[in-house]
């Protein structure tokens, strides 16, 4: 069997889908990308952060140089609290030194354009293809689109985001063939407790390119990333009055965006900069509910879902796109081993492919679960959700030295890369050294933060009594 005899149908032409297309192209596996939008890189006001583990994979694919031309590398982080206390850390530079790649922040539209421009077979990237149904024909899959087209292949990959049609179809087929295999508890596990207003503004005096700012406030936080030519990418993450299930989450309009933002125009971002300085200079902005969840069941037979369709996180840790890129690398590695390097004379059977995908899911979920839990903690820490989190954010973290950078380094170092392409020569020593730091980091976290919280708890208990 030749690799080109195996065909992958990729649903979704965003970061994960286009990265997977490039990866499959490198190993000679056939594919088609079906994107429901009319254009591959629309301007929606969104931005994207690329951390070293995502950047390393993009570098393997020959893309990171184009990313670097579009960014102002982050080197400094400022943190502000509502009592006026501010502190500065060199964590972005520390991570750059450890891993050889800068923290990059750019327009999502630009990132998508870079990914599309790199495609050598653009005829395989099809827009205006909204998927309506997927059918399992035992040893092949057929995808149906709204315009009446059909596409048949050996594997369907859902890279179609948090509102994934592929996930819905996977659950439908699983219930039809093996009732109860995906529990209702899992299906309803995604929740919404925060909204996110995100935008891009013209340069603001006082916000310096390469210096990110996190402004902690009660029940909300601001994240700002001044980039190339001073343009500022920003997020306002605001806690809702109650937690909603995914199916009952509120939907927002542009009018809602203004209503939310006008409440906080006088909030200080950093120094003398107020949120109104960003709002009055905005070029584009939008609002969305922030879904949070990490599903356990990523695959069924010849369908697998990746990226936001399986794990959705708040943007505070910047892990969303990077985890999706990692998913792609791990899946491409699996397909390379299964289809390309083995001397087999026929395609993998449904049973063989299903077993491989179950192993893929188990490995990815083991890693994603930890990152997802960290993301949940950080968004609540920055929104000062509880008294203990307020105390930890205000008093422990500013005095914890490089511990936050060490924790981030451990997460980065544990990432997968494409094993069929060379590791970039610019990789730093952190990829190896921080893979061996798990026990040491656990000591710092348990031996540092937990006792501090216990002491605070005892003090608060005495005050109450």
Swiss-Prot record:
Transmembrane segments annotated in the record for this chain: 9-29
Membrane topology of this protein: Single-pass membrane protein
GO annotation terms (biological process): terpenoid biosynthetic process
E.C. designation(s): 1.-.-.-
Classification via Gene3D superfamilies: FAD/NAD(P)-binding domain
Keywords for the protein's UniProt record, in alphabetical order: FAD, Flavoprotein, Membrane, Monooxygenase, Oxidoreductase, Transmembrane, Transmembrane helix
Phenotype on disruption: Abolishes the production of 15-deoxyoxalicine B.
Protein localization: Membrane
Binding site for FAD: 35, 49, 108, 308, 321
GO (cellular component) term, any one: membrane
Chief localization: membrane
Superkingdom of the organism of origin: Eukaryota
InterPro entries assigned to the protein according to its UniProt record, in alphabetical order: FAD-bd, FAD/NAD-bd_sf, FAD_mOase_fung
An MF annotation (GO) of this entry: monooxygenase activity
Pathway: Secondary metabolite biosynthesis; terpenoid biosynthesis
Keyword Oxidoreductase in annotation: yes
PANTHER family according to UniProt: FAD-BINDING DOMAIN-CONTAINING PROTEIN-RELATED, FAD-DEPENDENT MONOOXYGENASE ASQG-RELATED
Job description of the protein: FAD-dependent monooxygenase; part of the gene cluster that mediates the biosynthesis of 15-deoxyoxalicine B. The first step of the pathway is the synthesis of nicotinyl-CoA from nicotinic acid by the nicotinic acid-CoA ligase olcI. Nicotinyl-CoA is then a substrate of polyketide synthase olcA to produce 4-hydroxy-6-(3-pyridinyl)-2H-pyran-2-one (HPPO) which is further prenylated by the polyprenyl transferase olcH to yield geranylgeranyl-HPPO. Geranylgeranyl pyrophosphate is provided by the cluster-specific geranylgeranyl pyrophosphate synthase olcC.
Family, as annotated: Belongs to the paxM FAD-dependent monooxygenase family.
Note from the entry: The 15-deoxyoxalicine B cluster is a rare cluster that contains its own geranylgeranyl pyrophosphate synthase (olcC), in contrast to other related clusters which rely on a FPP/GGPP synthase localized outside of the cluster.
Official protein name in the record: FAD-dependent monooxygenase olcE
